[in-house]
């Protein structure tokens, strides 16, 4: 597959990718607060479904802390191909003090700025935004 083909597909899928990211950002998966335990589980469940929607298999594995999500893509003749590990985390930091937020941190928005469009919301740059690059 040529690089131009891959880049064209990324451009074609951009709006859908942003919608997927905004969905994940709406889940308040704050792992440092036990009150958000169910939200962390919900984020893991969401990721399993999202990975599966991309044509991969995915499973949620329990750990002593929060669940780990593992996805696999198994192309034909994969036994002779190298393995690639894509690692990231789906939890976010607390929003305290909430008074410093201009908007609800879990109601992400695409905003126009002087430097172009940005996505604002808790986790958009640590680490849900990076996680969704797959």
What are these language model-derived features?
Residues 2-131:
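Acidic/His- and Gly-rich active-site-bordering loop/insert found
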Residues 134:
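Carbohydrate-associated surface elements
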């Amino acid at each position: 597959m040529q690089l131009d083909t891959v880049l064209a597909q990324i451009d074609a899928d951009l709006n859908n990718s942003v919608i997927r990211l905004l969905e994940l950002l709406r889940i308040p998966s704050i792992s440092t607060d036990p009150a958000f335990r169910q939200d962390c589980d919900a984020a893991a469940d969401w990721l399993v479904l999202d990975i599966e929607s991309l044509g991969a298999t995915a499973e949620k594995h329990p750990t002593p802390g929060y669940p780990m999500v593992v996805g696999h893509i198994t192309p034909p003749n994969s036994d002779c191909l190298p393995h690639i590990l894509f690692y990231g985390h789906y939890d976010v930091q607390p929003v305290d003090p909430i008074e410093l937020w201009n908007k609800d941190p879990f109601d992400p928005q695409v905003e126009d700025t002087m430097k172009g469009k940005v996505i604002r919301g808790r986790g958009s740059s640590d680490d849900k935004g990076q996680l969704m690059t797959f």
